[in-house]
Amino acid sequence: MKFRGQGTTMETVQRQLLKNLSLKIAGVFFVAGLAGAVLTMAPPVYGALANVQISGYVFDLTGSPLSQAMVSVKPGANHQGADAVTVFTDAEGNFRFPASVGGLANPEQQISTRVLGYEQTRVTTASMGDAQKLTVIMRKTTNVANTAPASAWLANFNAADKESLIMNCVACHQVPAPEVRAYAKQIADVTSSDPEQVRKAGWTAIVKYMNYLLADRFGPEGSSPPPDANSAYAVGDTDVVTNILAHNFTGPLQVLDHYDYGAPLAVTPNTVIMEYEVPLPNTIREAVLVGSPRKLWAADVSSNRMFSIDIVTGKQEIHEVPTNGPMGPHSLLRGADGSIWITALFATSVLAHLDADGKTWHTWPLKTQKGDRVLIHDLSFGRQHELLTDKKGRIWFSDIGNSAVGYIDPKTGIVENFKAPEVAGRSGKASLYGLVMTSDRKHIWYSQVGNGIFGSFNVETLKFEKSVVLPSATSGPRRLTISDQDIMYVPLYGAGQLIEYDTRADKQLGIYDLPDRGSVPYSVTWDPKR
């Protein structure tokens, strides 16, 4: 097919679009350079401006205060501690950074403020002794494209298209992230008598590229042969997804007139977010805070590495998980003793445990007595979100590779798994994913993200018991949590909903729409204090 005024084939258009694509897309989509944690403690400060306390106000051009403004700062090059700190304004527009930030040499460059529907125009500073007072001025904008979340662009999708796109793409990156929107603009800029075909060609090219890049970045170091762009993990049905993209993203995606969060942000003026940058290359996707003094442990899924980060000083150390092959530390779970349990992404199939001292490792190969490999996603935990064994001391897990539940006896190394029953009309990759254990330590509940099912298994009788089939196969039940009363909460990743389920009564108590049905709830955690 030829394009009017272009004299190029469809394949040439695909190659040119990919050539123009910024290489930054790989870093943003697949390399999480920042491992973040929400903290409330204030570490000590170092440097010439160490004793300076930073606070301030956020106003619009009329002088009206802006509440729940997200104010972020990047300390200077010689700082110690977090590489970025974020706080939020109160109802009067006031904000205050923890003392650990210290003074700022160039606030105009170091301060970044985010408010839906506004853009930062100016930051002024007034220094008074050991205090630095900032005034941030924001200007209202009619285009909220740069401040609204990616989910804002999904508001007009029908439910089926939205769920399908989320289930296929958003596990790896937001859609449409800024880089995706930039790519959409490149597609829209192609002059053609058949723009729909251009869109299909462009989105087909990028979906294949994403599949290849994901497999390349998440594949174990030194793996061969190179991943196949047509069959790598991620988008299972390229045609379906590219048709959804081509049908719904018809323009350059540079202008968005309106978005509403639908609810207040889940923050207060006392909320502090601290982020720590880990040197590239890495593929960090999960971290856990343990130990005394507290350290943030982050898993690099593209290697066998764990990073430990001192949250006070920012000092980092690299720890290699002692295995004979590629592991890819994936899911992390605290033990009640302050230790860390680590599951593997790759088919090496090992379970690792790091003692509370942060030095002593234990690993177990994961093969059943029949010789079958297992691929753990989640380990059993209860209301404390800490490892919870059954009464025999067995650790239960979700086996995403075999759509099964199973256990390992850490004393003997014996591993056994039990494949979840198939459900009529729900064929395809079930992907048994999340896992929680009830307080009686007799039952585990699991989710199957790939086919819209969650259910229970009796760890004493070794039998599956309850199976709850959700109306939509792409609703996406994912990482579960459970309360002290054995009330389970199931996030529906694809549908943007939350299920409340009484595991003792085997009864669903409710299903709740999130304020933004495209916000993609991946995981939930029980918080007894709030």
What are these regions (language model features)?
Residues 310-314, 355-359, 409-413, 458-462, ...:
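Short loop/turn segments that connect beta-strands within beta-propeller blades
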Residues 166-177:
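The canonical Cys-X-X-Cys-His
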Residues 280-293, 324-337, 370-392, 423-441, ...:
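Beta-rich, blade/repeat-based domains predominating
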Residues 53-67:
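Structural motif
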Residues 126-149:
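Extracellular beta-sheet/turn segments enriched in Thr/Pro/Gly and aliphatic residues
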Residues 77-98:
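Short, acidic Ser/Thr/Gly-rich low-complexity loop/linker segments typical of extracellular
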Residues 78-80, 103-125:
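A short, solvent-exposed loop/turn motif at the edges and junctions
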Residues 297-302, 342-347, 390, 395-401, ...:
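Conserved beta-strand positions in repeat-built beta-propeller and related beta-rich domains
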